[in-house]
Regions:
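N-terminal beta1-alpha1-beta2 module of alpha/beta enzyme domains
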Residues: 1-72
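Flexible, glycine-rich active-site loops centered on histidine and acidic residues
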Residues: 2-20, 81-135
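Short, flexible coil/linker segments at or flanking structured domains
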Residues: 25-28, 60, 75, 90-92, ...
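Structural motif
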Residues: 43, 75, 105-107
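Catalytic metal-binding/acid-base residues of hydrolase active sites
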Residues: 46, 77, 109-111
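Glycine- and other small-residue-rich loops at beta-strand/loop junctions that grip anionic moieties
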Residues: 52, 76, 125
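Short, basic, helix/turn surface patches
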Residues: 66-74, 101-103, 132
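Active-site nucleophile and cofactor-binding loops and adjacent substrate-binding regions
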Residues: 74-82
């Protein structure tokens, strides 16, 4: 069996500055390696304190320099919201920074509010997702 930790970057504590929430989340992520976890995952969400991590590749890049054995995974890169070539470039760089420890997960996204904020019709999700996988 393998064990993993999912970073959601939730700010559930009223009055806690977002910067402190991010630092706390990163400290927990670093501890997962010390505790023997196999993988540390990061979600991608936008525009809501439920999960405040608009760029999970950036968050994992930070961890790449702070860890040495734990795998680092995207849970997930939401393809309809990202340009496929930029996703490939960013993941290539992250994989190099973490010496091949990257686990790449993709998704379509599920929150209508996120689609609306990006100005994307949610009905386009499947087509955008499929097109990104082919590109």
């Amino acid at each position: 069996m393998q064990t993993g930790y999912l970073m959601l970057f939730q700010n559930a504590h009223e009055g806690l500055p977002d910067v402190d929430m991010v630092k706390n989340e990163m400290r927990l992520a670093e501890l997962t390696e010390e505790c023997g976890f196999d993988v540390c995952w990061s979600a991608e969400h936008h525009f809501d304190s439920y999960s405040m991590v608009p760029d999970n590749v950036q968050a994992l890049s930070y961890l790449a320099g702070r860890t040495s054995t734990i795998k680092l995974g995207t849970a997930a890169v939401i393809l309809p919201w990202n340009t496929p070539i930029r996703v490939a470039e960013k993941l290539s760089m992250l994989d190099a920074l973490c010496d091949g420890r990257l686990v790449f997960g993709v998704g379509r996204g599920l929150a209508r509010t996120e689609y609306e904020s990006f100005g994307i019709d949610m009905e386009e999700a499947r087509g955008r997702f499929d097109e990104a996988l082919v590109d």
